[in-house]
Amino acid sequence: MRTLALHTAMLLLVALHAQAEARQARADEAAAQQQPGADDQGMAHSFTWPENAALPLSESERGLRCICVLGICRLL
């Protein structure tokens, strides 16, 4: 009876250890994704020209904006 209890306890410890390792691996992956520079491909960049830019702009060009995502830029 003691042997059965010891084997059951050891089996539970092994199962808990495996779960802890899996959770730690997921936490490490999440931490790596949150660090800046880890994956810049999904980052969007936006550029806006101020109203008092050095070059005079026509009325249609005022507030011209460029949005770049994954290497594709489009003007708004």
UniProtKB/Swiss-Prot annotation:
<feature type="propeptide">
    <location>
        <begin position="23"/>
        <end position="64"/>
    </location>
</feature>
<feature type="compositionally biased region" description="Low complexity">
    <location>
        <begin position="30"/>
        <end position="44"/>
    </location>
</feature>
<keyword id="KW-0732">Signal</keyword>
<dbReference type="InterPro" id="IPR002366">
    <property type="entry name" value="Alpha-defensin_N"/>
</dbReference>
<dbReference type="GO" id="GO:0061844">
    <property type="term" value="P:antimicrobial humoral immune response mediated by antimicrobial peptide"/>
</dbReference>
<dbReference type="GO" id="GO:0005615">
    <property type="term" value="C:extracellular space"/>
</dbReference>
<dbReference type="GO" id="GO:0002227">
    <property type="term" value="P:innate immune response in mucosa"/>
</dbReference>
<feature type="disulfide bond">
    <location>
        <begin position="68"/>
        <end position="73"/>
    </location>
</feature>
<dbReference type="GO" id="GO:0019731">
    <property type="term" value="P:antibacterial humoral response"/>
</dbReference>
<comment type="function">
    <text>Has antimicrobial activities against bacteria and fungi.</text>
</comment>
<dbReference type="Pfam" id="PF00879">
    <property type="entry name" value="Defensin_propep"/>
</dbReference>
<keyword id="KW-0929">Antimicrobial</keyword>
<dbReference type="GO" id="GO:0071222">
    <property type="term" value="P:cellular response to lipopolysaccharide"/>
</dbReference>
<comment type="similarity">
    <text>Belongs to the alpha-defensin family. Theta subfamily.</text>
</comment>
<feature type="region of interest" description="Disordered">
    <location>
        <begin position="25"/>
        <end position="45"/>
    </location>
</feature>
<dbReference type="InterPro" id="IPR016327">
    <property type="entry name" value="Alpha-defensin"/>
</dbReference>
<protein>
    <recommendedName>
        <fullName>Demidefensin-3</fullName>
    </recommendedName>
</protein>
<keyword id="KW-0211">Defensin</keyword>
<dbReference type="GO" id="GO:0050830">
    <property type="term" value="P:defense response to Gram-positive bacterium"/>
</dbReference>
<keyword id="KW-0044">Antibiotic</keyword>
<feature type="signal peptide">
    <location>
        <begin position="1"/>
        <end position="22"/>
    </location>
</feature>
<feature type="propeptide">
    <location>
        <begin position="74"/>
        <end position="76"/>
    </location>
</feature>
<dbReference type="GO" id="GO:0050829">
    <property type="term" value="P:defense response to Gram-negative bacterium"/>
</dbReference>
<dbReference type="GO" id="GO:0050832">
    <property type="term" value="P:defense response to fungus"/>
</dbReference>
<keyword id="KW-1015">Disulfide bond</keyword>
<keyword id="KW-0295">Fungicide</keyword>
<dbReference type="GO" id="GO:0051673">
    <property type="term" value="P:disruption of plasma membrane integrity in another organism"/>
</dbReference>
<dbReference type="GO" id="GO:0031640">
    <property type="term" value="P:killing of cells of another organism"/>
</dbReference>
<comment type="subunit">
    <text>Forms a cyclic homodimer; disulfide-linked.</text>
</comment>
